[in-house]
Amino acid sequence: MKLCGFEVGLNQPLFLIAGPCVIESLQLQLDTAGVLKEITSKLGLNFIFKSSFDKANRTSGSSFRGPGLEEGLKVLEAVKTQIGVPVLTDVHEYTPIDEVATVVDVLQTPAFLVRQTDFIRNVCAVGKPVNIKKGQFLSPWDMKPVVEKAKSTGNSQILVCERGASFGYNNLVSDMRSLAVMRETGCPVVFDATHSVQLPGAQGGRSGGQREFVPVLARAAVAVGISGLFAETHPDPPNALSDGPNAWPLHTMAMLLETLVELDAVTKKRGFLEQD
């Protein structure tokens, strides 16, 4: 499958979707995107910048949600033109999807909305590549009918993204078998290494996270075999305005990606026995 001008799949090198969880300021987005572009260019890693203009599912009603649609799209367009990278953002049921699609290169559907049939179809009908996040409450094989809904619009540029499964209260677990199961959708599989270590609502009015396990799960997923890695990053995670506890520090992103690129090459060199 071609995505933003490059090929993705198990027979292609790993690609990266990364950026701050939410748009905090124009300068933060430009600086972060610039650092990520420099790192990925050195590694020969295809890169899509990600950030949200509205976080609609915050734990607390008083938490920062983002700058909103109008200002958010201006920031994403600035990143796209000034840094020279494709951009991704998530949309919601109330979002004017056509307007967002005039700026961004990839649309993303939130995990909590994965079962909303009309929403999935409406997003995919725009014709842009779509990254569909698997709900924390959904089994990996249940992504097959979701993809069928998506592709019924005539859009074949569909990615499926694993971001962990609910494991009791305030916890997520990553079953690496799901990455192989989700390949059966016929779509490139992306692993979200940062939301997978989230502890939803675990800090009372906000979610916690265990960012120390981001490289652990990222290495495991790449060793299983994935098309892309999703990782939210921030120059100062403790002071990030959204999902700081599970954001990977920007200053150590290069070291993490160097390891993953090497591991990806080894994993894909001989193919996958489970597909024989």
From Swiss-Prot:
The keyword Transmembrane does not apply. It catalyses: D-arabinose 5-phosphate + phosphoenolpyruvate + H2O = 3-deoxy-alpha-D-manno-2-octulosonate-8-phosphate + phosphate. Its main location: cytoplasm. The keyword Transferase applies. One of its GO terms (cellular component) is cytoplasm. Keywords: Cytoplasm, Lipopolysaccharide biosynthesis, Transferase. InterPro entries: Aldolase_TIM, DAHP1/KDSA, KDO8P_synthase. Pathway: Carbohydrate biosynthesis; 3-deoxy-D-manno-octulosonate biosynthesis; 3-deoxy-D-manno-octulosonate from D-ribulose 5-phosphate: step 2/3; Bacterial outer membrane biogenesis; lipopolysaccharide biosynthesis. Its EC number is 2.5.1.55. GO terms for molecular function: 3-deoxy-8-phosphooctulonate synthase activity. One of its GO terms (biological process) is keto-3-deoxy-D-manno-octulosonic acid biosynthetic process. It is an enzyme of class 2 (transferase). It is found in: Cytoplasm. NCBIfam families: KDO8P_synth, PRK05198.1. HAMAP family: KDO8P_synth. PANTHER family: PHOSPHO-2-DEHYDRO-3-DEOXYHEPTONATE ALDOLASE. Belongs to the KdsA family. This is 2-dehydro-3-deoxyphosphooctonate aldolase. It comes from Xylella fastidiosa (strain 9a5c). The lineage of its organism: Bacteria, Pseudomonadati, Pseudomonadota, Gammaproteobacteria, Lysobacterales. The gene is kdsA.
